[in-house]
C-alpha cells in the first residue's frame, strides 16, 4: 500500500532502522516490490546480515534501476562493494567499484568518480593481505584482561586499557566500541613498525579528514593472536596543545573492525575481562536492540525515554555519556527544565570544539525495559559540524560500568546487561 511505502521510505531517508524493522515485519507484504527490496537491503545491512544484504542490493539494482534513480544506484553499488569487503572478499569489492567507476567516467562529476577510485584502491590494498588471520584449530573463545585508567592526570573519568603485543612490542590499547576502525598515531605506527600503504579512508570526528591504512603483522591481546591487522593512521593532536594533553589516551585504539570478527563478546566488569568468542550465542531476544550505521559500522543501541525511543552510539571510548542535539530537539522542555546551561569542550579527531550545552544532574532511561540512571549528563543544544555531538549522542563508559556484565551479540544484534 502507499501508506506502508511512505512509512518505510521515511525510515530509510531518516536512517530509522529499528522503526523500519517493525514496519517491515508488520507490513512488508503490502509494500511495493521496490520499497520492499530497498527496505530488505537496508535492514540486512543495519542488522549485520551481510550475505543477505549483498543478495538484496543486487536484486534491488537489477530490477529497479530506473525507479530508484542514478544517485541511489551509485550509493547502493558502493554499499554492495563495502558489503563484499565485510564478507572478506576484497577482490569482489574492488571489481564492483572499478566497474561502477568505469561506467561513470566522463558522465558523472569528477569528485564522485575519484571517490569510487579511492575505494577501489582501498579494497585492492586490503585484498593483498589475508586480514585477521587466526591459528586454525585454536580456542573458540579468548580472554582479554583490561584495566580502567584515568582519562588524564586531573580526571576522575576512566577509559578501558588493554595490554597488547603489537609486532612483538608491548603496547597499551584503548578499547573503543565507538571507533569504526583500529587507530594508531603516526609516531606509534613507526615505533611498532606497521607496514604503511597508500590506501586511505575517510574519518569523521570534530571534523572530516582522511587516514592512511597500515598493516600490523601480528597483534596479541590476552590469549588471542591475530595476523595482518589493519589500522588507520591518524594524527590526533594535529598541533593542538589541549588535544595533545589527552591524545595519548587514544594513540592506539582497538575498534569495531576487530570486534566485528567475533559473533559475540562479553565485557565483565567484576573480573575486568573481555571475552571474545567465535561461538554463536543463543539469545532470548527475538528483536534486535542494536544496529549498525550502513557506512561506518558503529553500533547504536535503542533507548526508551519520555514515551519514545531513539538510537544512540555505544561508545566505550568515551569516558562519559553525552547527548546530542537531536535529543535536545526532541526533549527541549525536559532539558530546559532540569538542565543548567554551560559551555563544554569535546575532543576528538580534528581537534577541540566548544558546544553550548545543558547539564542534567541525573537522567533515567531504559534499555529493553531495563531502567538505568546516569548522573551529570551534558546535552548539546546547538547543531554543529562536530560529529561527536550530532544525532542523539553516545553512551559512554559510565553507562557500561553500571553493570556487572555487558554482552554484545554481533550475530543477533543484541546488547544484554546484568
Language-model segments: which ranges?
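Pepsin/retropepsin-fold aspartyl endopeptidases
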Residues: 1-418
Amino acid at each position: 500500500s502507499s501508506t506502508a511505502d511512505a512509512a518505510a521510505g521515511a525510515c530509510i531517508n531518516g536512517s530509522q532502522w529499528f522503526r523500519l524493522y517493525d514496519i517491515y515485519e508488520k507490513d512488508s507484504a503490502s509494500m511495493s516490490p521496490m520499497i520492499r527490496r530497498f527496505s530488505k537491503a537496508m535492514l540486512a545491512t543495519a542488522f549485520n546480515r551481510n550475505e543477505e544484504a549483498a543478495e538484496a542490493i543486487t536484486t534491488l539494482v537489477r530490477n529497479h534501476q530506473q525507479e530508484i534513480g542514478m544517485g541511489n544506484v551509485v550509493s547502493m553499488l558502493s554499499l554492495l562493494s563495502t558489503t563484499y569487503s565485510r564478507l572478506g572478499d576484497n577482490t569482489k569489492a574492488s571489481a564492483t567499484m572499478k566497474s561502477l567507476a568505469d561506467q561513470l567516467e566522463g558522465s558523472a562529476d569528477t569528485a564522485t568518480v575519484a571517490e569510487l577510485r579511492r575505494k577501489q584502491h582501498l579494497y585492492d590494498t586490503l585484498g593483498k593481505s589475508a586480514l585477521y588471520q587466526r591459528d586454525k584449530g585454536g580456542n573458540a573463545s579468548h580472554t582479554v584482561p583490561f584495566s580502567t585508567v584515568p582519562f588524564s592526570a586531573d580526571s576522575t573519568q576512566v577509559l578501558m586499557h588493554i595490554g597488547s603485543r603489537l609486532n612483538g612490542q608491548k603496547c597499551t590499547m584503548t578499547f573503543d566500541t565507538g571507533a569504526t576502525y583500529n587507530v594508531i598515531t603516526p609516531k606509534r605506527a613507526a615505533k611498532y613498525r606497521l607496514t604503511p600503504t597508500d590506501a586511505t579512508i575517510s574519518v569523521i570526528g570534530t571534523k572530516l579528514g582522511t587516514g592512511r591504512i597500515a598493516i600490523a603483522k601480528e597483534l596479541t591481546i590476552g590469549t588471542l593472536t591475530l595476523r595482518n591487522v589493519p589500522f588507520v593512521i591518524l594524527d590526533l593532536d594535529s598541533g593542538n596543545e589541549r588535544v595533545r594533553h589527552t591524545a595519548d589516551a587514544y594513540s592506539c585504539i582497538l575498534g569495531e573492525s576487530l570486534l566485528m570478527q567475533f559473533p559475540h563478546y562479553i565485557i565483565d566488569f567484576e573480573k575486568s575481562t573481555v571475552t571474545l568468542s567465535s561461538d554463536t550465542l543463543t539469545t532470548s531476544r527475538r528483536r534486535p536492540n542494536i544496529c549498525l550505521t550502513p557506512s561506518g559500522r558503529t553500533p547504536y543501541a535503542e533507548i526508551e525515554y519520555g514515551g519514545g525511543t531513539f538510537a544512540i552510539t555505544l561508545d566505550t571510548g568515551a569516558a562519559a555519556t553525552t547527548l546530542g542535539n537531536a535529543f535536545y530537539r526532541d526533549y527541549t522542555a525536559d532539558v530546559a527544565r532540569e538542565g543548567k546551561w554551560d559551555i563544554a569542550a569535546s575532543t576528538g579527531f580534528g581537534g577541540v570544539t566548544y558546544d553550548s550545552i545543558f547539564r542534567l544532574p541525573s537522567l533515567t532511561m531504559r534499555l529493553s525495559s531495563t531502567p538505568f540512571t546516569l548522573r551529570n549528563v551534558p546535552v548539546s543544544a546547538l547543531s554543529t559540524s562536530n560529529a561527536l555531538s550530532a544525532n542523539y549522542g553516545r553512551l559512554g563508559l559510565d553507562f557500561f560500568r553500571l553493570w556487572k556484565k555487558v554482552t554484545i551479540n554481533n550475530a543477533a544484534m543484541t546488547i544484554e546487561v546484568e
